[in-house]
UniProtKB/Swiss-Prot annotation:
Gene that encodes it: gatC
Catalytic activity, reaction form: L-glutamyl-tRNA(Gln) + L-glutamine + ATP + H2O = L-glutaminyl-tRNA(Gln) + L-glutamate + ADP + phosphate + H(+); L-aspartyl-tRNA(Asn) + L-glutamine + ATP + H2O = L-asparaginyl-tRNA(Asn) + L-glutamate + ADP + phosphate + 2 H(+)
This protein's name: Aspartyl/glutamyl-tRNA(Asn/Gln) amidotransferase subunit C
Gene3D superfamilies listed in its UniProt record: Glu-tRNAGln amidotransferase C subunit, N-terminal domain
Catalytic activity, EC: 6.3.5.-
UniProt keywords, alphabetically: ATP-binding, Ligase, Nucleotide-binding, Protein biosynthesis
Statement: the UniProt record of this protein carries the keyword Zinc: no
Keyword ATP-binding applies: yes
Transmembrane domains' residue ranges: none
Family stated for the protein in its record: Belongs to the GatC family.
Superkingdom in the source lineage: Bacteria
Amino acid sequence: MSQISRDEVAHLARLARLALTEDELDSFAGQLDAILTHVSQIQAVDVTGVEATDNPLKDVNVMRADQTAPCLTQEEALAEAPAAVDGRFAVPQILGDSE
């Protein structure tokens, strides 16, 4: 039993402003019909007594211990920079007016 017609696919394509060829309309009609068939099968599953959930994983704010690690000094970080001003990287301005 077909759940979606070629004309319905054409209508959806127009709403989405998609230019589909005749072959694409036929192909997508079949694909969407298969998807809707699977959705119907899922909807038919008896879920009586199953608690609704939006996320089965209840891990919230999982933290790790802070650990220090070696890093570059400010001088080492700026050593290869094309330009630096007041101990910071200097980059060309890309937004707004210069001050």
